Design a protein with these regions (language model features):
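N-terminal pre-Walker A segment at the start of P-loop NTPase domains
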Residues: 1-32, 37
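ABC ATPase nucleotide-binding domain signature region
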Residues: 40-42, 53-117
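The conserved Walker
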Residues: 46-47
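Conserved glycine(s) of the Walker
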Residues: 50
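GG-anchored amphipathic helix commonly corresponding to the ABC/SMC/Rad50 NBD signature/C-loop
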Residues: 131-155, 163-175
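Conserved D-loop beta-strand region of ABC ATPase nucleotide-binding domains
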Residues: 154, 184-185
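C-terminal lobe/lid and adjacent interdomain/linker elements of RecA-like ASCE P-loop ATPase modules
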Residues: 163-181, 188-238
Length: 238
């Protein structure tokens, strides 16, 4: 039985203009529906493949601020989200999340600033700007992870060392075991290694489920580690 908060998304491409860049994204062509059957779902693919665009659309359609934060964050420093949010319908389950957060690396500074502005005596600021970038990014993620929550993360590994990624991995896994749901865009072979997750690959003109070992993130990392000198010789020799 699927007990996820977001059980899937249905696309209505008739609501998108024919000249929209969205219709030029190869992975989107022909896609009508995507199911979320696991507590943790990953989107992987090359830059520009549409994975962050879809995650953002899911977030906005579900009521989150396009730049990130909880549903209570209402601000806009640069309105750039796509119209895809108006062309999707989210299939929601019988459960309702008790907490939620949309975390994206590219607008982290703005969200951290707003967190300080929204702070009061009952909800003191975590002072993210007083920490290093990596420490503050991990702290923000940790402070907003709760059981039975819904979390949309866009490249959470961007500011994190490999060791910190392992810390985040453990917390995501633990939280998912307590009823939370995660949809995560990532290039990290570390995060992708979380057990019992679905991985959607955005490649070859489609969106499809794939195994961990079949992801480019894993294959390129493995190839580099196992054949570092040979690869460097090929890449760096004129």
């Amino acid at each position: 039985m699927n007990d996820q908060f977001l059980q899937g998304v249905i696309f209505d491409w008739d609501r998108i203009d024919n000249d929209s860049y969205l219709k030029k994204i190869k992975a989107f062509k022909g896609i009508q529906k995507l199911d979320f059957n696991k507590a943790i779902t990953f989107f992987v693919g090359e830059n520009g493949s549409g994975k962050s665009t879809l995650l953002e659309a899911l977030a906005v359609a579900h009521g989150f601020n396009p730049e990130g934060g909880t549903k209570n964050y209402v601000f806009s420093t640069h309105d750039t989200h796509s119209e895809l949010c108006d062309a999707i319908r989210i299939s929601q389950g019988y459960r309702k999340e008790k907490w939620g957060y949309f975390l994206r690396a590219e607008s982290f500074y703005n969200v951290a600033t707003k967190e300080e502005e929204y702070a009061d005596l009952a909800h003191p600021s975590a002072k993210y700007h007083e920490k290093s970038h990596g420490e503050s990014f991990l702290a923000l993620a940790q402070n907003n992870l709760h059981p039975n929550g819904l979390y949309l993360f866009d490249e959470p590994e961007a500011a994190l060392s490999p060791q910190r990624q392992l810390t985040l991995l453990m917390q995501i896994y633990s939280c998912a075991k307590e009823g939370a749901q995660f949809i995560i865009v990532t290039h990290s072979p570390i995060l992708l290694g979380i057990p019992d997750a679905d991985i959607y690959c955005f490649d070859n003109g489609r969106i499809h489920l794939c195994e961990y070992e079949d992801t480019e993130s894993y294959q390129v990392t493995e190839m580099f580690i196992n054949n570092r000198q040979m690869l460097l010789d090929r890449l760096l020799t004129d």
